[in-house]
Swiss-Prot record:
Record HAMAP family: GlcN6P_deamin
Pathway: Amino-sugar metabolism; N-acetylneuraminate degradation; D-fructose 6-phosphate from N-acetylneuraminate: step 5/5
UniProt KW keywords: Carbohydrate metabolism, Hydrolase
Gene: nagB
Enzyme class label: hydrolase
GO molecular function: glucosamine-6-phosphate deaminase activity; identical protein binding
Pfam families referenced in this protein's UniProt entry, alphabetically: Glucosamine_iso
TM ranges: none
Function noted in UniProt: Catalyzes the reversible isomerization-deamination of glucosamine 6-phosphate (GlcN6P) to form fructose 6-phosphate (Fru6P) and ammonium ion.
Protein name in UniProt: Glucosamine-6-phosphate deaminase
InterPro entries noted in UniProt: Glc/Gal-6P_isomerase, Glucosamine6P_isomerase, Glucosamine6P_isomerase_CS, NagB/RpiA_transferase-like
Organism of derivation: Exiguobacterium sibiricum (strain DSM 17290 / CCUG 55495 / CIP 109462 / JCM 13490 / 255-15)
Residues at the catalytic site: 64 (proton acceptor), 130 (for ring-opening step), 132 (proton acceptor), 137 (for ring-opening step)
Catalytic activity: alpha-D-glucosamine 6-phosphate + H2O = beta-D-fructose 6-phosphate + NH4(+)
Length: 252
């Protein structure tokens, strides 16, 4: 696992986007990027929209979708992606699970097969304050494939800001599993704010345990973590020095 700690919080999105752009430019023959939703990637998508790099050779696959929400629902992740990225960037193909399907488990199997067929070259991730990645909550087996999951109360409360009321936040989601995510060739995880500091410390310096799903990333061969100072605040002094030095070298 490699990591960078950016000097200023506002640089987090640009640095993260530049890492993605390197892959987009490096692979004109075709590239599959796994995309995330929530607050963590918003700045990255804003940088992407402004840059308008040619992505007609890029296929995207999203991590998850709420069960019960149709693609045109204002709070679906289909709509989220359309508003924050897809309406400004022309991709070859873009895929998001269908949350309004009559059989979410069948849709999970279909989506798992699709992801396996495409193969993810680089996966963009955020991290929850409880260490979840995608909607893989604490306790999810490390070998889990795409599945239907029940959302914890803390996750629903964290996502309430995207809805009018807590009661409107769905209780289930279709999500790529931890095992599915780990099959990506590269992983880019972006985290900011003190609210993520404990999860980041556990992910980077704690033991690999399903109590903090993101700790599995310690076992992946190619992970880059981009943090602001607040998210990195609980890391060891040595880890902070390493992350700051990596950022300095990247910016040269």
């Amino acid at each position: 696992m490699k990591w960078m700690i950016v000097e200023k919080a506002e640089e987090l999105a640009n640095v993260s986007y530049q890492l993605l752009k390197q892959e987009i430019v490096r692979h004109p023959e075709g590239l599959t990027i796994g995309l995330a939703t929530g607050s963590s990637p918003l700045g990255v998508y804003e940088e992407w929209r402004k840059d308008r790099v040619d992505c007609r050779h890029v296929t995207t696959v999203n991590l998850d979708e709420y069960v019960g929400l149709s693609p045109d629902h204002p709070h679906s992740y289909h709509t989220f992606m359309q508003e924050h990225l897809f309406d400004a960037v022309d991709f070859k193909e873009s895929y998001v699970p269908i949350g309004s399907t009559a059989d979410p488990r069948e849709e999970s199997d279909r989506y798992e097969a699709l992801v396996r067929q495409l193969g993810i070259d680089i996966q963009l991730l955020g991290i929850g304050s409880n260490g979840h990645i995608a909607f893989n909550e604490p306790g999810t087996p490390f070998d889990a494939k795409t599945h239907v999951t029940k959302l914890t109360e803390s996750t629903r409360q964290a996502n309430q800001r995207f809805f009018d009321r807590l009661e409107d936040v769905p209780t289930e989601a279709i999500t790529m599993g931890i095992g599915t995510i780990m099959e990506a060739k590269k992983i880019l995880l972006v985290a900011s704010s003190e609210r993520k500091a404990e999860a980041i410390r556990d992910m980077m310096e704690g033991p690999a345990t399903t109590d903090c799903p993101a700790t599995i990333l310690q076992r992946h061969a190619d992970v880059m973590v981009v943090l602001d100072e607040e998210a990195a605040s609980l890391l060891s002094d040595e880890a902070k020095r390493t992350g700051r030095a990596a950022y300095t070298n990247f910016m040269k």
